[in-house]
Amino acid sequence: MPSATATPRRDDLRLGDSLQRLALWLRDHVLPAWDGVRFTAMARTSGGVSYETWLMDVEDPAAPAERHTRVVVRREPLRGPVEPYDVLDEAEVYRALHSSGVPVPRVLATCDDRSVTGRPFIVTEFVEGDVPDYRTIQRRPEWRDERRRAGMAREFLSVLAELQRVDWRRVVPVAATAPPGPRRPSARSRRTRRPTCGPSR
């Protein structure tokens, strides 16, 4: 995986001691069996609905051949066109959907301690695959192939159907935005928060 080469911003994860703090946090909350965490490659992906999405290859310096993996770090943006942002809500949705037929990554840990990376973030497993950019999809080979394009459409509709089967009332961030009814408590009383920092449960 190539490293990101864009000019880093002031609060970029690659600047200062942000990576060192993140490495310590990953060891404590995601990879507790490791002696330490060392980054071997990292790149910020495009898209992400304004959230920062980083692919990170990590290894244990004490046993790099046996202990290495790739994780995804999603961090809240400073600002964006669809505020407010809440990456911890996103993690709750992922958790709720994980047992359904909707393909989502497994949440490994969450953190809203701003002393780690400056903003709340979550860590998920890496799922191999390709997410076509809707802005350029018509130029992709699979789009020009009628059979493959039909397959993409069927896959999309299949996932959409699985999403429709999910009971939205069990997805806390979604249920919390619905207007309270006579037989349902208000969003404020229904809403609960995960621990400040820690592994997924």
Task: Please annotate each region the language model reported.
Residues 2-39:
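Juxta-kinase regulatory segment immediately upstream of eukaryotic protein kinase catalytic domains
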Residues 43-200:
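ATP-binding pocket architecture of kinase catalytic cores
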